[in-house]
Amino acid sequence: MPVRLVVTLKQSVRRCLYRRWEGQVVGRELRTKTVALERMYRGNTPYPIGRTRRTAKVYASHAEGARALKVMAARRRARGYRVA
């Protein structure tokens, strides 16, 4: 059974279409690392990637809405997200 698992892991490494990560089978374990292309695509977010939450709140003025967006971006940055 473990042998079949290693074969499956090797096939999945080979089939990784968009080069999101690179894998290497060492003994019976699969070691993966994120490639630079994936880091460019999703920034520094923890995997899996998801959309940032947006509220459907309506602000009184354009300036107030813009300020709220800046506050949200600052909060994301503080939590370790890289804002593009």
Task: Show the residue positions of the predicted features.
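Local beta-strand/beta-hairpin segments that build beta-sheet-rich folds
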Residues: 4, 55-56
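Short aromatic-glycine-(Arg/Gly/Cys) micro-motifs in beta-strand/loop hairpins
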Residues: 14-55, 79
